[in-house]
Amino acid sequence: MRFEPPKEEEIKTIFSQFKEVRFLNAGGFKAVYKVVANVGYEAFKIVHIPETSGIEPEVSNEIRKESLGRIAREIRILNDCKSPEIVKLGSIQPKQVILSNHEYVAYSEEFLDGNTLRELIKQSVKPSEEDLRSLFISLLKAIRELWSLNVIHRDIKPDNVMNLNRKDRRYVLLDLGIAFSISDTPLTFNGANRLPPGTYRYLAPEMLQPGFRESLDFRSDIYSAALTIYEYAAGQHPLAKNKDDLIATLSRIVRESPKSLGEYRADLSPFFIGTIDQMLKKIPALRPSNINLLIDKLEKNV
């Protein structure tokens, strides 16, 4: 069933305290609105709980449990994160609501005024190495913060990174809706028979292997961060092609080595190109794993 975001007027009927509601975007089963709430502008998020009518009660309960569990996990992680490189929760506490006979969970995050990397890529922006290093450092700090909580983001991609164009807080990582906690009970219902949650173009190769959850760690986020930086720098994804079907894309992720970033951006330093290339290795053990050392080298402009 296609997700239709609730109308702005519908939201105002439930949240009468909003002085202004403006739809921003939607993806998956989530919609985001810019609202004027208690403390000024906030990003109001409304997440649809899938309908399960016509499904066996036991399966229906598991699907609902997974959906609500992911929302609760995301909110808990955001509440625990202190890094400015990760989006913050807003003032509106989670609330289950019914709109047009559909069930949602609604809450807010801080409103971030900027552009996603996806928008900048579409504008054919060619970032400088200084800009790319700043992005690199921000993503590494976000990954480090999440891993300190035993969490893997699992969906780092250009759509989920915001450029605020501020010296004190240049890039921010968004959307922890499918974050994975190695210390929690797995949420995915019937996970052995489903592809892993995530955006397939940005999946690390190991996530396509049987039993991947048992050995998953922050190096999967390292891989996805490198893909994101590569695509922003080069203006194109190193493996996925726009006309590919899902199977072709997944096959490239597992089997094909990407071209060096240097083939598209020879103006970048050998250290920067080499580090991104190394982060895109198929085997996690071959990727750089000392985040603090990487940040130190990037900050010192090695």
Give short role names for the model-derived ranges.
Residues 147-164:
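Catalytic-loop of the protein kinase fold
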Residues 191-207:
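Conserved activation segment of eukaryotic-like protein kinases, specifically the C-terminal portion
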Residues 58-80:
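AlphaC helix of the eukaryotic protein kinase fold
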Residues 82-93:
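Conserved HxN/HPN-centered segment at the entrance to the catalytic loop
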Residues 135-136:
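Activation segment signature within eukaryotic-like protein kinase domains
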Residues 99-116:
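Conserved short submotifs of the Hanks-type protein kinase catalytic core
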Residues 116-127:
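AlphaC helix of the protein kinase catalytic domain
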